Amino acid sequence: MPTAPRTNRRRLANAATVIPLAIGLASAGLPGGQPASGPSDGLAIVQKGSFNPVCTLPFAGVRNPALDDRCGIQGGSSDPAKQAESRAKNNFCAAKQPPKNMFYQDLIDLQKQAEKEKVPKSLPDRGAVEKMGEGEYVSYVAMIKDAHYSDVAKGEAVNCNLPGEVTNDIHIVLMSDPTDPDECNSTTAEISPHFRPPSWTPANLNALKKPVRIRGHLFYDGSHTPCRGTSRPNPKRASLWEIHPVYSVEVCQKENRDPKGNLEQCRNTSRAEDWVPLDEVLSSERN
C-alpha cells in the first residue's frame, strides 16, 4: 500500500523540531483506557519528556505512567539514527487503509532485498527501508512459539533505557510452521509498552495455542542480525522485517487436529467471524 513520500515525512519531522513542546503535551490529560486523537502522522512531533499519541490509537490503550510520562516518541538516545529508529518503532498511525496481507516468504524476500541493497545498520534517514515497505500497515497469520518481555535488565533506546517489564516491549516469536521448533526460522512482532492494554501480556499470548492474526506497522530492525548457516544470534530470527508496533491481536476460531492444516485454514479464511480479538477471547474464558 502507498506510504507518505519521503520529502513529506522529512518536512513534517523538520517542522516538528521548531514546534513548542507544549503542543505535543496537549493531550496529556487523556483519561486512561480512552483512545487518543491528534495529528494523523505518527512521525510528525518530537517529544522528549512524555509520550502523547499524535493520532487515534489503533487499540483501546491505557496510559502507562512509568513510561509514557518519561519517554517520548524519539526515545532516549541522542544519536539521530536511533531517534529515527525509535520514531518508526513508535508509529501507531499506519492504519490509514486496509492492511496488506503479508506471508512468511514476503518477509524472507524483504530480508534478501535489504541484504542485496546493503542497507546499513545505522539509518539517520530511513528512506531506503521506507521504499521497501517500512511504514505499511500489514496483517500476518502465524503461531506464537513464545512471548516474553525483552530488555528488562537495562531497557533499550526506544523506551529511554528504563529497566523492567512495564517499560519494555513484549517480544513475540512467530512460526509459519507450527511443527518447526527452530526459532532461526521464526519472524517477529513487538508489542510496545506505550499505552499497552493490560490484557496484552506474555502469559495470555503464550496460553493461546491457536493461530493468531497480528496487524501493525511494518518495521526493519537493523540493530539485530538474522540467523545464517551456523550463526544463531539472539534473538533468533529469519528476517529483520517485523511487525512493530503491534496494533491488534486476533485469535482464529477454526478447529483442526492437524496444526499445519489448522494454520492454513486460518490463513485462507475469508469469514470475519473466524477471527476474535484477544480481549474478547480472554473475556469469554473468564465467563
What are these regions (language model features)?
Residues M1-R9:
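N-terminal secretory signal peptides that target proteins for export/translocation
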Residues R11-N14:
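Short, hydrophobic alpha-helical membrane anchors of single-pass surface/secreted proteins
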Residues A16-S27:
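Bacterial N-terminal signal peptides
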Residues L25-S37:
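Bacterial Sec-dependent signal peptides at the C-terminal "C-region" and cleavage site
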Residues A36-N287:
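OB-fold and OB-like single-stranded nucleic-acid-recognition modules
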